UniProtKB/Swiss-Prot annotation:
Residues 136-373 form the Radical SAM core domain. [4Fe-4S] cluster 1 binds at residues 17, 53, 82. The gene is rimO. One of its GO terms (biological process) is tRNA modification. Its main location: cytoplasm. This is Ribosomal protein uS12 methylthiotransferase RimO. Its cofactor is [4Fe-4S] cluster. Residues 376-441 form the TRAM domain. CDD domains: Radical_SAM (cd01335). The keyword Cytoplasm applies. GO terms for molecular function: 4 iron, 4 sulfur cluster binding; aspartic acid methylthiotransferase activity; metal ion binding; protein methylthiotransferase activity.
């Protein structure tokens, strides 16, 4: 008879944004460290954890459906994540859920797991976790979360009510994690938070320490330190504070990627005021021009909302005019959707759905034309590409201008002598509005 003890198995579902993905990775790393197996199927698991998203109504619905599926297939379910902040809403639909915790409640999640599926016995000297921890991304890139929460109160958003005010991670801790990731083979770090440019504001940019050296807790100092690791560093979710200007020279010098993800949301000063967002559109255009003068290779990504309450045709036209002048490289656009608990719900003059749809189509048509023109400028040039996938037909990678999942790709047909994580030089042969095609130099 075998005396091998069966390891308890945990199923895991991770929904939502990269910030939620990082939370999932942390929970999974702790579970693996304690000796739990993480399995891909519900019926094979002793319990299922669902890390939910609650940002917009469609995300709430997806989360509730995932919880329901886990209950049907397994029966023992713990819920965490952003929707977990709305306990009553979950209990009303799924009363059989065992436990519910809010976002970044790692310790609570683990305590609940220990209660229902006791910790297994395992050899503490046998490492069950890779050096970089359990990652849900490919091995060659990783998200680095530098803070939690947000101090802004944008009227379309409920993140602060779910994740709280800004809490910056100690800079020494952040840099140590980055170093571990690089040592484990990561070639690209994507810096994320709810508000990356506010990093350190809550601690008055106090001085921390890394490897015995003093380092200021700020976005600029963080970028300076990350640049020493010799990998690609990409900034996401950058609020347009004045000090963002200070990172552009670092991009021009090649210290971090010339890529800025800066959600602007709209271009009408009146709508921006209703959103409780910065409203100096002329100033933003001047800054964009200045940034490009300092760093000609700069890629600008942004997101916008159309059909926000009170948006008139004149407001929308201001947005289109802004797009024409700014000529942003990568743009996402969302039709405004009411979110339970958001301040914008109480605003007058809600925009009809058919008007939102019509404006969204006009927005996308214009931006696709701009994006296609911007990418066409790259044809004939040589660029660096990091490889993401390789199969018998060729390789797929990304340029410095492309973040994983949300931007375009570079297709290298017939190029099979590479592996994920390789950075190679490519000549661009063709382009459309989103992607590039090229050949290895």
């Amino acid at each position: 008879m075998s005396n091998v003890t069966r390891q308890p198995k945990i199923g895991f579902v991770s929904l939502g944004c990269p910030k939620n993905l990082v939370d999932s990775e942390r929970i999974l790393t702790e579970l693996r460290t304690e000796g739990y197996d993480v399995v891909p199927s519900y019926d094979d698991a002793d319990m299922v954890i669902v890390n939910t998203c609650g940002f917009i109504d469609s995300a709430v619905q997806e989360s509730l459906e995932a919880i329901g599926e886990a209950l049907t297939e397994n029966g023992k379910v713990i819920v965490t994540g952003c929707l977990g902040a709305k306990v009553d809403q979950i209990r009303e639909v799924h009363p059989k859920v065992l436990e519910i915790t809010g976002p970044h409640s790692y310790e609570q999640v683990l305590e609940h797991v220990h209660h229902y599926v006791p910790k297994p016995k395992h050899n503490p000297f046998l490492s069950l976790v890779p050096e970089q921890g359990v990652k849900l991304t490919p091995r060659h890139y990783a998200y680095l979360k530098i803070s939690e929460g947000c101090n802004h109160r944008c009227t379309f958003c409920i993140i602060p009510s779910m994740r709280g005010d800004l809490v910056s991670r100690p800079i020494g801790e952040v840099l140590s994690e980055a170093k571990r990731l690089v040592d484990a083979g990561v070639k690209e770090i994507l810096v994320i938070s709810q508000d990356t440019s506010a990093y350190g504001v809550d601690v008055k940019h106090r001085t921390g320490f890394h490897n015995g050296e003093p380092v200021k807790t700020s976005m600029v100092d963080l970028c300076e330190q990350l640049s020493k690791l010799g990998i690609w560093t990409r900034l996401h979710y950058v609020y347009p504070y004045p000090h963002v200007d200070d990172v552009i020279p670092l991009m021009a010098e090649g210290k971090i990627l010339p890529y800025l993800d800066i959600p602007l949301q709209h271009a009408s000063p009146r709508i921006l005021k209703l959103m409780k967002r910065p409203g100096a559109v002329d100033r933003q255009l001047a800054r964009i021009k200045q940034w490009r003068e300092i760093c000609p290779e700069l890629t600008l990504r942004s997101t916008f909302i159309v059909g926000f309450p009170g948006e008139t045709e004149d407001d929308f036209q201001m947005l289109l005019d802004f797009l024409k002048e700014a000529r942003l490289d990568r743009v996402g656009c969302f039709k405004y959707s009411p979110v339970e608990g958001a301040g914008a719900n109480a605003l007058p003059d809600q925009v009809p759905e058919e008007v939102k749809e019509e404006r969204w189509n006009r927005f996308m048509q214009l931006q696709q034309q701009i994006s296609a023109e911007r990418l066409q400028e790259k044809v004939g040039r040589e660029i660096l590409v990091i490889i993401d996938e390789v199969d018998k037909e060729g390789a797929i990678g990304r340029s410095m201008a492309d973040a994983p999942e949300i931007d375009g790709a570079v297709y290298l047909n017939g190029e099979t002598n590479v592996k994920p994580g390789d950075v190679i030089r490519v000549k661009v042969d063709n382009a459309d509005e989103y992607d590039l095609w090229g050949s290895r130099v």
